[in-house]
């Protein structure tokens, strides 16, 4: 190939490049170095809370049942990364979501680390009661902005779901158990197509009014763009303050990080993600996984935003679960790291 230019001879390999960009150490502890401070973009929150949904939303769509001990080990590994919220399981009927049939065993088996919250999903009062009996101290309810999706996902209309949620939330508040609310199909539905921002706002407002401390707005099938994200959030934020909102983006069309950046620029500072980009949706064929936690942290680190999460440790947890379920990671950052080790 002839003589290479001297600059090319000294080109950094992937591993060196990763070390330049995968910030940890002081940033994990909450302090930013000079380079990180210089990279901060104006108008963005200084801190972003990441809600890790891999053990629940990420694994629920796996066709092969993941052994309970693998789920427990994944959660325990994630608990040591600096993540403050890890959604661990769902107290739904095993007939509808067989992957979550071991919810009580998972709750009993995990080690609950100080400073980490472990919410679970509960679709109705019975699920809530089972969750509390298993030791849950925080729950979430999951509604939809699409009538068709609500009927497919939780087997009832939106109006009927609100009645169920009111029962759950009232019981939870009586026991001082915080409740998070999910709104699926916030940017599109696999059955109805486009969903109006007004519909998303209506459902979100009702959940917030019932007492949900935070509303997570989900792009369930990953069709959103920064433009549609902006329009939806502008509508919802007329009724709910940005500090009580989160975004939950799937990456079907490769728009998740762009959509998240849009949300951050609008004042949102809570983002859902899944280790290794695990996930999909059992009621939305073709939907790919959640935005990968590794890729999200990499982007946030690169903008000088603090998450308190150690990216290296998240990648280790991702490598563990991908080997356990015989999958290739969906995280671009993890893929780059793996390729670097092959050099």
UniProtKB/Swiss-Prot annotation:
Membrane topology qualifier: Peripheral membrane protein
Binding site for substrate: 56
Molecular function per GO: hydroxymethylglutaryl-CoA lyase activity; metal ion binding
The protein's Enzyme Commission number: 4.1.3.4
Lipid attachment in record (N-myristoyl glycine): 2
Gene Ontology CC terms: cytosol; endoplasmic reticulum; endoplasmic reticulum membrane; membrane; perinuclear region of cytoplasm
Active site: 281
Domain Pyruvate carboxyltransferase intervals: 48-315
Subcellular location: Cytoplasm, Cytosol; Endoplasmic reticulum membrane
Main location: cytoplasm
Pfam families per record: HMGL-like
Catalytic activity: (3S)-3-hydroxy-3-methylglutaryl-CoA = acetoacetate + acetyl-CoA
Cofactor needs: a divalent metal cation
GO biological process: ketone body biosynthetic process
Superkingdom of source: Eukaryota
Pathway: Metabolic intermediate metabolism; (S)-3-hydroxy-3-methylglutaryl-CoA degradation; acetoacetate from (S)-3-hydroxy-3-methylglutaryl-CoA: step 1/1
Keywords assigned by UniProt, alphabetized: Cytoplasm, Endoplasmic reticulum, Lipid metabolism, Lipoprotein, Lyase, Membrane, Metal-binding, Myristate
Amino-acid positions noted as binding a divalent metal cation in the UniProt annotation, renumbered to this chain: 57, 248, 250, 290
Family designation: Belongs to the HMG-CoA lyase family.
Reported function: Non-mitochondrial 3-hydroxy-3-methylglutaryl-CoA lyase that catalyzes a cation-dependent cleavage of (S)-3-hydroxy-3-methylglutaryl-CoA into acetyl-CoA and acetoacetate, a key step in ketogenesis, the products of which support energy production in nonhepatic animal tissues.
NCBIfam families noted in UniProt: PRK05692.1 (NF004283)
UniProt-recorded name of the protein: 3-hydroxy-3-methylglutaryl-CoA lyase, cytoplasmic
Species this chain originates from: Mus musculus
Gene: Hmgcll1
């Amino acid at each position: 190939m002839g003589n290479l230019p001297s600059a090319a001879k000294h080109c950094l390999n992937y591993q060196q490049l990763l070390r330049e960009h995968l910030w940890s150490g002081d940033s994990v502890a909450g302090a930013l170095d000079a380079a990180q401070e210089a990279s901060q973009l104006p108008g963005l929150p200084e801190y972003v809370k990441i809600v890790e949904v891999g053990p629940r939303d990420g694994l629920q769509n796996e066709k092969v049942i993941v052994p309970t001990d693998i789920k427990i080990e994944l959660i325990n590994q994630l608990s040591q990364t600096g993540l403050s919220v890890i959604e661990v399981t769902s107290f739904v009927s095993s007939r509808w979501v067989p992957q979550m049939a071991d919810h009580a065993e998972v709750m009993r088996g995990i080690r609950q680390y100080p400073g980490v919250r472990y919410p679970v999903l509960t679709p109705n009062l019975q699920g809530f009661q089972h969750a509390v009996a298993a030791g849950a101290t925080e729950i979430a309810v999951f509604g939809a902005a699409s009538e068709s999706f609500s009927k497919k996902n939780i087997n009832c209309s939106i109006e009927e779901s609100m009645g169920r949620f009111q029962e759950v939330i009232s019981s939870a508040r009586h026991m001082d158990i915080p409740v998070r609310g999910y709104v699926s199909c916030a940017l599109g539905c696999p059955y109805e197509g486009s969903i109006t921002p007004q519909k998303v706002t209506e459902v979100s407002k009702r959940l917030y009014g019932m007492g949900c401390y935070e509303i997570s707005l989900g792009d369930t099938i990953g069709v959103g763009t920064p433009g549609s994200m902006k329009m939806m959030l502008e509508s919802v934020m007329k009724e709910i303050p940005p500090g009580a909102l989160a975004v939950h983006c799937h990456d079907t069309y490769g728009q998740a990080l762009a959509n998240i950046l849009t949300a951050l620029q609008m004042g949102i500072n809570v983002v859902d993600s899944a280790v290794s980009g695990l996930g999909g949706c059992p009621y939305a064929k073709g939907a790919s996984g959640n935005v990968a936690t590794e890729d999200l942290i990499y982007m946030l680190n690169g903008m000088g935003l603090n998450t308190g999460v150690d990216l290296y440790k998240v990648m280790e947890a991702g490598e563990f679960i991908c080997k356990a379920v015989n999958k290739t990671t969906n995280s671009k950052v993890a893929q780059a790291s793996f390729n670097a080790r092959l050099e």
